[in-house]
């Protein structure tokens, strides 16, 4: 809920919010075999006020996330608070950022992400599986020129992962122009087929 996250960001405050952005290496080079665009949380010379902090709290404002970095951040919730380093070739995974979240915080968020899919009212419930525990989060990013712009488009996001080391997968899917097509729910439905295929092969 945008209101919840906006209020949370205001309660956290600019100093702590920006500190966590930096802890997550948002804006820094992503360690990867190929060149990637950097994520960002603020433009240069941006005036920071309560409206900006509130918008940033629910992923709007000037936040631009590289999908690979977002997927890496989600890995911390099944890795006791440490973020895995992304890589192309399957092999031993290295840790990129250690202990960015506490084990307790990671466990709490993991349980919330599980409910997004396990709960019948969850936004990701349509990909629920009886035989494997899935955790995920949907999101919709508005792309518009100003607060009053009603003609802008939307990006739909969905990240899903298993919590079982025997069936490890983490997928982040982004679909452009999901406005009037079901928002992030449209993305969930298009994530289902590749996820089902992977799980059926295990």
Place the predicted regions along the sequence by residue.
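Beta-lactam-recognizing serine transpeptidase/beta-lactamase-like catalytic domain environment
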Residues: 1-175
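Noncatalytic linker/hinge segments flanking ATPase motor cores
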Residues: 12-13, 178-179, 201
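Short, gly/Ser/Thr-rich active-site loops of penicillin-recognizing serine hydrolases
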Residues: 94-97, 188-202
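A short acidic/glycine-rich loop-to-helix N-cap element
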Residues: 176-189
């Amino acid at each position: 809920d945008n209101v919840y996250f906006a209020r949370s960001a205001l309660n956290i405050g600019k100093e702590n919010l920006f500190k966590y952005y930096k802890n997550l290496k948002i804006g820094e080079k992503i360690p990867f075999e190929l060149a990637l665009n950097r994520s960002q949380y603020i433009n240069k010379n941006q005036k920071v006020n309560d409206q900006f902090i509130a918008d940033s709290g629910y992923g709007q404002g000037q936040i631009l996330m590289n999908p690979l970095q977002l997927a890496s951040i989600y890995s911390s919730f099944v890795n006791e608070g440490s973020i895995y380093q992304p890589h192309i070739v399957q092999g031993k995974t290295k840790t990129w950022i250690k202990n960015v979240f506490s084990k307790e915080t990671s466990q709490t968020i993991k349980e919330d992400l599980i409910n997004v899919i396990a709960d019948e009212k969850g936004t990701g419930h349509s990909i629920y599986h009886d035989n494997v525990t899935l955790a995920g989060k949907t999101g919709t990013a508005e792309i518009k020129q100003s607060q009053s712009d009603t003609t802008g488009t939307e990006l739909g996001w969905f990240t899903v992962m298993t919590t079982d080391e025997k069936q490890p997968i983490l997928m982040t899917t982004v679909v452009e122009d999901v406005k009037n097509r079901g928002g992030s729910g449209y993305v969930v439905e298009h994530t289902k087929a590749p996820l089902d295929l992977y799980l059926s092969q295990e």
